[in-house]
Every structure is written in C-alpha cells, then in structure tokens.
C-alpha cells in the first residue's frame, strides 16, 4: 500500500520575506524519525523576534545553494517552528540529522515562511483520511505533528488521474470535461472525455492536496 503524499499550502504565504540567517545544529533540537526522508516535519528553534521578523506562523523554510560539480543546486528544508528565546537573533537551531541534509552543522541560509511542503504518511497510520471528501477539514496534529487544520482541495491516484470536486464518490470515471482539473482546453468551448477520480479519498489515492485553514 503506497504512502499518502500530503501537499500542504499556506494561502497567507504569498510573497514571503527572505532573510539571511545563521543556522546551527544543536543538541537542544531532537531528531524526529523520518524527518530526513520527508516522512516527518522536523523542528527548528528561533527566538520570538526572529519569528516576527520573518512573519512566520507555523512553518519555516531554510534554503541554501550548493556547488555540486559544475552545477549549483538548491537545497531546502521545511521546519515546524518552536520559539526559544535562548536562541540569538537571526539564528536558527536545527537537529544534527537535518544539518546532514545541508552538508554542514554551521552555515548561512535564507529563511522564509513556508509556501508549500510535501510529507509522506503511511496509509496504515492515516486510515482516518479514507472517506473524506474535497472540502473536508481535518486536524493535522495527530497525523503529522502540525498544530493546524487542513482543508482538502484535491488529489490524484497512482496513475496521475486527478480528483474532481464535482464528481461524487471515489471511483475512476471517464467524463466529458471543459476545464481543470483533468483537462486544460486550448480553445474556448473545447471539451474532451477524460479519466478522473471522484471527490472522495480512497486507498488508490496517492497525493492529497491541502491548504492550511485558520
């Protein structure tokens, strides 16, 4: 049974403020099983002043550019923010496990409010999602450790067929479409018969798109 890939978007993070910060691996930040593999949201500690400067609510992104051979590669990590006023201004503490992802335990990075992140969840641990529909809201804390509510906006199955909000049920169907999701017309009035999924999450769904609701 494949994992659910839950895509989380923050609708209030439109043009996030980017600030250069110092990042340190700290024993004060515990590693979480699965954080390096995208199966858990790692923790980052910042002080209240830095949190407000970044206009961060719950999630923070750190980004660096690394030289790999003749190419420059961006490395990003998304973190759940924990306020700790013992952390100096413009500094972020992360776990040693996440520091390995960036290739250093002491480095500079751009920090900003997270726009989108993806996390993989074992379907056996997320059985409460099966049967939910597009538009439903669920608590993310118990499932992925984030103290937020998530609203389901869509998704797709393991063949890439998208869920449609206006088709009842979980079954795969072939219907006539005039617009997305499932079909993007090139001309006004163009319609095509396409395969889609209904609006209900089943075990065949592999990606669930959500937004944070407040």
From Swiss-Prot:
Keywords: Ribonucleoprotein, Ribosomal protein. InterPro entries: Ribosomal_eS6, Ribosomal_eS6_arc, Ribosomal_eS6_CS. GO terms for biological process: translation. Pfam families: Ribosomal_S6e. Transmembrane segments: none annotated. GO terms for molecular function: structural constituent of ribosome. One of its GO terms (cellular component) is ribosome. Belongs to the eukaryotic ribosomal protein eS6 family. This is Small ribosomal subunit protein eS6. It comes from Saccharolobus solfataricus (strain ATCC 35092 / DSM 1617 / JCM 11322 / P2) (Sulfolobus solfataricus).
